[in-house]
């Protein structure tokens, strides 16, 4: 594990300790991302309100440490497999939206945070006949999916 990964893991542990949550934190290096897996009793606290606390924690980690990574990967913070499930749900929704775009023209998805937008763009890129574009000036942007 690299120094930046250790620092990111330590930050997550410190934030959880400050919230008085005794949870386990494991940093896993994968080809796509550096995953910070949180587990243990009480993890549901991070998943309330559609995982907003988990999203915020992921944004903080990426803002603080992503630029120190030697490649273009980012950090993915997951708790009790919640993010993994939501990611697959978003991929399925993107594929469905791509099919609609093929039949009836450009389709919008959003507003989406940067992590979700990246996932949508990567899913669309799997089909060479389709393209995607983010529009908007705010943190949450809309993704337009259309045929090339």
Regions found by a protein language model. Give the residues of each.
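RNA-contacting regions in translation and RNA-metabolism proteins
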Residues: 1-148
